[in-house]
Amino acid sequence: MPKTIVEDNIDILVAGAGLGGTGAAFEARYWGQKKKIVIAEKANIDRSGAVAQGLYAINCYMGTRFGENNPEDHVRYARMDLMGMVREDLLFDMARHVDSTVHQFEEWGLPIMRDPKSGTYMREGRWQIMIHGESYKPIVAEAAKKSADKVFNRICVTHLLMDDAKENRVAGAVGFNVRTGDYHVFKSKAVIVAAGGASNIFRPNSVGEGAGRVWYAPWSSGSAYGLMIEAGAKMTQMENRIVLARFKDGYGPVGAYFLHLKTYTQNCNGEEYESKWFPALTKMVGKEYLDTEGQHLSHKPIPTCLRNHALISEVNAGRGPIHMVTMEAFQDPHLEEIGWHNFLGMTVGQAVLW
């Protein structure tokens, strides 16, 4: 018979223990040495969240200590890639903290690849650094477990509790154990919502069995949005959705393949297809965001959404599926080894396919 369990006198409750929640717990302990910190996670903290099965790159690292980039550079890049739909203050605030976070991960034992000549972190693109990330989440989870007074695994937080005495103030949260059905009540002075985003808002090309293997994490059910909106929180940047190009039967990330291994895409006829759609896209969005004549001179990236638009347009024109060509890169045994490691560290099924 399910029972009710009450956890009282919490100073800081962290709802969700993916990479964001684990980091929040560590920071909470750093700044609040004597506070009671509790984590509630709907899976198991060691392998939960978007990087649960590993990740082979950290996709944002300034490299300020190596003289590579500054936070201002990243704001300009993101503003371009997202076609102006950004909060620059939030971007800058994230960018100025990201390097110290990466250095912290390395101190905890995360293996980060280095350039053997320069000694700097190995880049796969301007912003991405390459890691051996199959144990990414367990490493960060260990720091969170040491920081928290209690960790409740298998607890799905469903609602935030509002304070009757103070308007617009959260006083805790409730949820249930997904294994036993036990009802949990957490009474807390503050709640950090680090629950998942929302995957599968759009129907993926992956259907049937593949629907559960899409990337981003299929278990991201919109909890972070639902909890906050119902409690009356102000939401910002909600109009920005990350939509990533994925390829037939692969599902997983391809950043290292494009940026480091220099692979490229083609349609079902073996043709390069992106450039044929660029003139029409330039008319649609203007030369500020897509100038095929001057893009290489300004070093501006072509916005991701426009690349996606070209891919979707090509498929709709009957020339899909779109493939990623790996044969040329894999003529180099060293690059082939990197390709294998890349997928085995985060998307094993993709390594078998490609």
Language model features: what each stretch is:
Residues 12-39:
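N-terminal Rossmann-like FAD-binding beta1-loop-alpha1 element of flavoenzymes
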Residues 99, 106-159, 163-169, 239-354:
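Mobile, glycine/GP-rich and aromatic-enriched active-site lid/loop segments adjacent to catalytic centers
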Residues 193-253:
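Glycine-rich loop(s) and the adjacent beta-strand/alpha-helix scaffold that form part
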Residues 43-76, 211, 253-257, 261:
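Conserved N-terminal glycine-rich FAD pyrophosphate-binding loop of Rossmann-like flavoproteins
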Residues 45, 63-111, 230-237:
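Conserved FAD-binding subdomain of flavin-dependent enzymes
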Residues 1-9, 15-22, 44-62, 90, ...:
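Conserved N-terminal glycine/acidic-rich loop preference
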Residues 16, 188-190, 194-195, 268:
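Short, well-ordered coil/turn residues at beta-beta hairpins
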Residues 7-10, 179-190:
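Core beta-strand elements of the Rossmann-like FAD/NAD(P) dinucleotide-binding domain
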